[in-house]
Amino acid sequence: MTRIRVAIRVPVGRPLRDIAAFAARCEDAGFDGVGIHDHPSSGRDAYLALALAAQATRHLRLFPATSSPVVRHPLVLASLANSLQEIAPGRTCLTVAPGFISTRSIGQPRAGLKFMRDAIGDLRHLLAGETVGFGPTATRLRNRTAAPPVYLLAAGPRMIELAGEVADGAFLMVGLDPASIRAARRHLEIGATRAGRTLADIPVVFVVTLGLGPNDTVGAQWVRSWFQPGQPFLAYPSVANLRWLREAGFELDEAHDPTAIPEDRAHQIADAFGLFGSPERCADRLLQAREESGVDDVFLFPAHDLAGGYAMPEAEVDAFERIIRSRLGV
């Protein structure tokens, strides 16, 4: 059976050198990777944090989680990705997404499909050393290293199809229910077919929400909570979450009141949505997802609301080192 590779989201919630030390702590705890969120409004740059983390670690996979080509021009992103690959050869990838907090902070909407298609194409061409036209200007990336792969973080069906068509790989936030994963893979395959590829050509990392607690009631608590006023927890970071919950048999309106979800129903939704409860239960649920759906590469996304978005995942790293790691056989 394939070993499950596990990375974890780390926010820029501390001074940069402390974040690098925390990345080293994650490596020692047994994680395969760390993704540092790219929110320029935080006042701390994700790529500087990743560069320092690269110097503090030996084999940890490092990537932004995630960068928006709306906020950072594709040439800037390509240069940053190339630089990070130079510092940590073979340990990096570039992950891009339409944007949420980062685009909102500059007063711009999320990127649409065409914008992301063009941006990913430009990024891959630049990283391959090819010339790309920006308006009347032809530009080429100099001082290249080996090209890092470009992953698209996709939540909705059409964005998942785009990942299958134009990206080197996909980060999918579709929950853990087998029906949801099957549906998402069908869309990934649609995109892959357009480009003459198969699913086997596209590495997939599943973005999995993790909410630790003494028992599984914590899952229902998160499901019945708000991310911020007017935005249910289940609709963060994308309302597309509700699309995949429908595949799992749960009908929720985009503007639903989470507090009105019956508690027993909330427990079921939590089990389809992510990993909730004790470390032992979370590990067993992840093993179940591997057995049912072949989930073998995950990016843990610690559950949080807007106010808690910069809290460091201390408890999650501790639980992984003490319990989850050995239970997964990592």
Predicted regions and their residues:
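N-terminal beta1-alpha1-beta2 module of alpha/beta enzyme domains
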Residues: 1-65, 148
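An alpha-helical appendage that flanks or caps ligand/catalytic pockets
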Residues: 2, 109-141, 181, 186-292
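Active-site mouth loops of central-metabolism enzymes
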Residues: 4-17, 67-74, 144-155, 210-213, ...
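Hydrophobic faces of well-ordered beta-strands that scaffold small-molecule active sites
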Residues: 4-10, 34-36, 61-65, 92-96, ...
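Short, acidic/polar
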Residues: 14-26, 77-80, 154-165, 279-289
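Acidic (Asp/Glu)-rich catalytic clusters
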Residues: 23-28, 50-61, 81-92, 164-165, ...
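Glycine-rich, proline-tolerant flexible connector loops at the mouths of alpha/beta enzymes
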Residues: 33-56, 68, 100-102, 175-178, ...
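Alpha-helix-loop-beta-strand connector modules within alpha/beta enzyme cores
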Residues: 47-67, 71, 119, 126, ...
